């Protein structure tokens, strides 16, 4: 099998682009603000993906919601990692520190991360994997975010990609 990889970032200067360059993987930036409409952004993103024959899209810190044309072009071929145990602390506006702030404000004892397929509903696609992470006394949103990344996100996402690529999940 031949795998073509490409990193598409939603903003310049992100660490993913540096990592891609260091690994010899092409990186491009497609920023929503560079386009007059969401539809134009989606068309540019789709064009980039199609030009590079991308079969699987993995969202990791891509802070733009994908529109219907992208989702329809990649049914059950777009993975997203979310920094909470869906269905908790998810949906529009729940990104970055916000899920961690919400979990702490609610007094939760555990949080975690979820890998799911992307569909038309924000964070509403079928769940592939989840991993719980303890919330410790004195946690701040920043400390919790780092723990969730290290203990859950960085483990779940590669596992989910491998499962999809091997055909274990389709």
Predicted segments with their positions:
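Short, small-residue-biased leader/transition segments that mark boundaries at the very start
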Residues: 2-3
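Non-catalytic terminal and connector segments of soluble metabolic enzymes
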Residues: 8-27, 47, 51-56
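Donor/substrate-binding cores of folate-linked one-carbon enzymes
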Residues: 10, 56, 60-170
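Short alpha-helical
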Residues: 12-15, 36, 64-65
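Short Gly/charged-rich anion-binding patches and loops
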Residues: 15, 44, 98
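Generic alpha-helical structural signal
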Residues: 21, 43-46, 146, 158
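Short beta->alpha connector loops at strand-helix junctions that form conserved
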Residues: 28-33, 89
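Glycine/small-residue-rich loop that forms an oxyanion/phosphate-binding "nest" at active or ligand-binding sites
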Residues: 37-50
């Amino acid at each position: 099998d031949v795998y073509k990889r490409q990193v598409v970032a939603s903003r310049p200067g992100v660490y993913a682009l540096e990592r891609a360059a260091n690994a010899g993987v092409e990186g491009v930036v497609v920023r929503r603000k560079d386009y007059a409409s969401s539809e134009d952004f989606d068309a540019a993103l789709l064009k980039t993906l199609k030009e590079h024959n991308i079969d699987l899209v993995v969202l990791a810190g891509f802070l733009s919601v994908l529109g219907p044309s992208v989702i329809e072009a990649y049914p059950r071929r777009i993975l997203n990692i979310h920094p909470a145990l869906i269905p908790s602390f998810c949906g529009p506006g729940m990104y970055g520190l916000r899920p961690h702030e919400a979990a702490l404000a609610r007094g939760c004892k555990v949080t975690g991360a979820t890998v799911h397929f992307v569909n038309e509903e924000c964070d509403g696609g079928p769940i592939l994997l989840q991993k719980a992470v303890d919330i410790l006394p004195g946690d701040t949103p920043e400390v919790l975010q780092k723990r969730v990344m290290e203990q859950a996100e960085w483990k779940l996402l590669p596992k989910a990609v491998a499962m999809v690529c091997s055909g274990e999940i389709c």
